[in-house]
Amino acid sequence: VIHYDARSPAADYARLEEAAAAEPRIRLVAKRVAGRWGSFGLVEAPLNAMKEIEAAGIEPGYVILLSGACLPCRPVAALERYLTENAGREFIEVADASWIGNGWRNERWKYRFWFDHKTQHTAEWLSYQAQRRLGLARAFPKGLTPRFGSQWWALTWDTCRAMLLDMARDPKRLEFFRTVWIPDEMVIQTWVHALVSPGEIANHGLTHFQFSNRGKPIVFQDDHVDYVASLDAFFVRKVSPLAEKLRAACLALAGGPDDGASFGPVGPRREDYPLKVMAQTWYPGPGQVFYRDQQVDMTDTVLAAAETPYVVALGPVPL
């Protein structure tokens, strides 16, 4: 089931419709929404996909949320075996506010966030300050407890269906989340906490991702082929659209046979790439170390923002 962002060019969507029409296993979500960063659309899109599954009468064992930047890093046959061996487990992070590394915690839901963080940051900040000073904090919806976690999950269809039913009983509770901060890290997690017993929640997903020290997602390139193949996960993100070698390797892995080996721990974060993580920042900064296989974003905007000269030191050459 594919949700295609409503902001995408109509011509691109028309080509997707044509391709999907020839493949009966593919369904397109009719009710498309815009999926901007931190917007409710990132929650609404997967919910609309669940409704599409329900309306079609499909009965999957699991629903796995992936983006266009995700690719498999293990055989699909191995994934099927893993889900069979762990039937009934919900693969999602469900944590209290301590899960949030820094920044707003309970403020995420106590106050209303109407403005786009990336394009209306000043208005967002002024609105938050005004609400805080005027004492306009609100209560969390009755019967729910705020929970947080990564937006990348794999849930049983029974839980997805129960979630849709519970949301439909009292639509005002879901409406509350339209104005929370980063709802995709809160909504599904909160409902899973309310509907599923703790023993059935794995507290990890099946998708590997990493962030830089500046909070930006690491984009995996062609030099990460061996690293990605070694991951204890079933999917990896974000994969660069230009990483043709890595994309081909991932697709080859997906179509390969299941070797039947016992599964080790799946889900624990790996931080064995710390130098790469620290080096790959959104923009270059003084004292930053770069690596020969790293692509640095040196746009005109970045260069114009440099108030003082930069000195770049090269070497030593590896022997």
Report each predicted region and the residues it spans.
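ER/Golgi luminal nucleotide-sugar-dependent glycosyltransferases, focusing on the catalytic module
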Residues: V1-L319
